[in-house]
């Protein structure tokens, strides 16, 4: 529709009741603290592509902040036998992981020569040093005491990461819920050293098999198993895209943090977070 000679184009573009004066009101930018957020990118090199590298990792950290928020809330809900809210939170975590998976496509537009030009400016900084990522790994049950060390230089960060390291994981709380539901979960899975990686247990698998064979009776437990499956499936996809993106950009060079790079990341693909939920699919 074209404006008539007596109409101002602005009257068509703007809703007449839209708030346009923010001299004394909170604006969109004020609410989101956009000055601070958009002022947090400080390239160290003259390379055009460093902005992509920074924004990729900063946005990933924002999504991980939301993941931690949802994971902690889901764990608390499971502890209180509030399964429906927990399902919503776990589904959201899986969707966040989808966002993180697709983000690798953007970073993959960086070619090997482009990354090589900015790599010297990164020093020994590396993604495995992310204190939010480490907390996510710990909350999902991948406990490794050595990964506390990169945060030892900051007592405040170390305290956060250590708290996740020492707490029961999401899967630990899922097994506790099964036990409270009357299922035969062995004491060794319910009372153990939470700082140690979880080891698969045949009796735990039998408990999950009961859930899956009698899903109508154990509907919440069954749904919990499937939400955990969705989450680990999404996490595996994220790990895989991480490996392929890194290999595409740096090949088999060592990582900036001193790891073996792609070789190290491929080993992470072998980590199984919720082993019995996957094994039961063969045994059903």
Curated annotation (Swiss-Prot):
Its cofactor is heme. Keywords: Dioxygenase, Heme, Iron, Metal-binding, Oxidoreductase, Tryptophan catabolism. Signal peptide: none annotated. It catalyses: L-tryptophan + O2 = N-formyl-L-kynurenine. Binds 1 heme group per subunit. Heme binds at residue 242. Pathway: Amino-acid degradation; L-tryptophan degradation via kynurenine pathway; L-kynurenine from L-tryptophan: step 1/2. Its EC number is 1.13.11.11. Pfam families: Trp_dioxygenase (PF03301). It is an enzyme of class 1 (oxidoreductase). Substrate binds at residues 53-57, 115, 119, 256. One of its GO terms (molecular function) is tryptophan 2,3-dioxygenase activity. InterPro entries: Trp/Indoleamine_2_3_dOase-like, Trp_2-3-dOase_bac, Trp_2_3_dOase. GO terms for biological process: L-tryptophan catabolic process to acetyl-CoA; L-tryptophan catabolic process to kynurenine. Belongs to the tryptophan 2,3-dioxygenase family. Heme-dependent dioxygenase that catalyzes the oxidative cleavage of the L-tryptophan (L-Trp) pyrrole ring and converts L-tryptophan to N-formyl-L-kynurenine. Catalyzes the oxidative cleavage of the indole moiety. Homotetramer. This is Tryptophan 2,3-dioxygenase. The lineage of its organism: Bacteria, Pseudomonadati, Pseudomonadota, Betaproteobacteria, Burkholderiales. The gene is kynA.
């Amino acid at each position: 529709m074209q404006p008539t000679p007596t109409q101002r184009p602005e009257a068509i573009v703007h809703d007449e009741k839209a708030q346009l004066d923010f001299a004394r009101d909170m604006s969109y930018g004020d609410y989101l603290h956009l000055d601070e957020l958009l002022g947090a990118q400080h390239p160290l090199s003259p390379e055009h592509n460093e902005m992509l590298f920074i924004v990729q990792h900063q946005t990933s950290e924002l999504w991980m902040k939301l993941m931690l928020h949802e994971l902690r809330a889901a764990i608390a809900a499971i502890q209180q036998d509030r399964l429906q809210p927990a399902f919503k939170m776990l589904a959201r975590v899986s969707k966040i992981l989808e966002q993180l998976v697709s983000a690798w496509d953007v970073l993959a537009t960086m070619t090997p020569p482009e990354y090589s030009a900015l790599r010297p400016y990164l020093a020994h900084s590396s993604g495995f040093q992310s204190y939010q990522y480490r907390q996510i790994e710990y909350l999902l049950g991948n406990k490794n005491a050595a990964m506390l060390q990169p945060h030892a230089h900051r007592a405040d960060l170390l305290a956060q990461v250590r708290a996740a390291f020492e707490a029961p994981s999401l899967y630990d709380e899922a097994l506790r819920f099964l036990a409270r539901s009357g299922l035969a979960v062995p004491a060794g899975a319910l009372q153990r050293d939470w700082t140690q990686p979880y080891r698969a247990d045949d009796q735990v698998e039998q408990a999950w098999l009961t859930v899956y064979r009698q899903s109508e009776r154990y509907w919440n437990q069954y749904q919990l198993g499937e939400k955990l499956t969705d989450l680990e499936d999404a996490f595996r996809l994220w790990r895989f895209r991480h490996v392929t993106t890194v290999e595409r950009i740096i090949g088999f060079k060592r990582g900036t943090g001193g790891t073996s790079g792609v070789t190290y990341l491929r080993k992470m693909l072998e980590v199984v977070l919720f082993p019995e939920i996957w094994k039961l699919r063969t045994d059903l």
